[in-house]
Amino acid sequence: MSKSYTLKAEIRERVGKGSSRELRRNGLIPAVIYGDKQPPLAIAVSYKDIFYKIHAGGFRTTVATLAIDKQKIMVLPKDYQLDPVRDFPLHVDFLRISAKSIVEVNIPVHFLNEDSAPGLKKGGVLNIVRHEIECTAPANAIPEAIEIDLSSYSIGDSIHISAVQLPKDVNPVIQDRDFTIATIVAPADMDVSDEVSEQENNEESE
């Protein structure tokens, strides 16, 4: 689980494009807090803080506390808008949560032991179908990543969600099929039949 952090914020008295431009000139960006059956709350947060949090990674899987005057609100960043040319943050949406909340998050997939994967050592290519997996998880226990060990996978193998050991209380949103996360495929110049024959010979000799 990523370490939680606190951001200072202030209530926005005005909304709209003119107000947003003024905020950005003063080193702030507009944001909104929604959810938990409460009306949306328009706020402003530090541009610098949000910029570094986004580019550090894990922004949408890490719980934050927004300090607004004497009030503290636990939130999960749900979405953000970037300038299409200069790639800096323009707006952030925060979901209001509690420690007991169950939230939907896209958790990144990390592949381990690529150097020792039999299929990759023989020239195979890791074809990643899903770089993230949409899951439900406790708000106070969102994993930083889902780790998949490649050390036992050969050319032609597929990695499905059923083969992945997820942390406690973390479940994929898709429940109606055993979806594929990645495959190890043969390079274009490899004869797959030779690889299959080699695997069969190895199994017979064991």
UniProtKB/Swiss-Prot annotation:
The cross-references to CDD domains, in alphabetical order and at most eight, read: Ribosomal_L25_TL5_CTC
Function per UniProt:
This is one of the proteins that binds to the 5S RNA in the ribosome where it forms part of the central protuberance.
- Do you know which PANTHER family this protein is assigned to? RIBOSOMAL PROTEIN L25/GLN-TRNA SYNTHETASE, ANTI-CODON-BINDING DOMAIN-CONTAINING PROTEIN (PTHR33284), RIBOSOMAL PROTEIN L25_GLN-TRNA SYNTHETASE, ANTI-CODON-BINDING DOMAIN-CONTAINING PROTEIN (PTHR33284:SF1)
Q: Which GO terms describe its cellular component?
A: cytosolic large ribosomal subunit
Which GO biological-process labels does this protein carry? Answer: translation
Q: Which InterPro entries match?
A: Rbsml_bL25/Gln-tRNA_synth_N, Ribosomal_bL25/Gln-tRNA_synth, Ribosomal_bL25_b-dom, Ribosomal_bL25_C, Ribosomal_bL25_long, Ribosomal_L25_dom, Ribosomal_uL5_bac-type
User: Gene that codes for this?
Assistant: rplY
- Output this protein's name: Large ribosomal subunit protein bL25
Family in the record: Belongs to the bacterial ribosomal protein bL25 family. CTC subfamily.
Provide a Gene Ontology MF annotation, just one: structural constituent of ribosome
Return the HAMAP family for the record.
Answer: Ribosomal_bL25_CTC
The annotated subunit structure for this chain is:
Part of the 50S ribosomal subunit; part of the 5S rRNA/L5/L18/L25 subcomplex. Contacts the 5S rRNA. Binds to the 5S rRNA independently of L5 and L18.
Which keywords, in A-to-Z order, does the entry hold? Ribonucleoprotein, Ribosomal protein, RNA-binding, rRNA-binding
Highest taxon above the source species: Bacteria
From what organism does this protein derive?
A: Bartonella henselae (strain ATCC 49882 / DSM 28221 / CCUG 30454 / Houston 1) (Rochalimaea henselae)
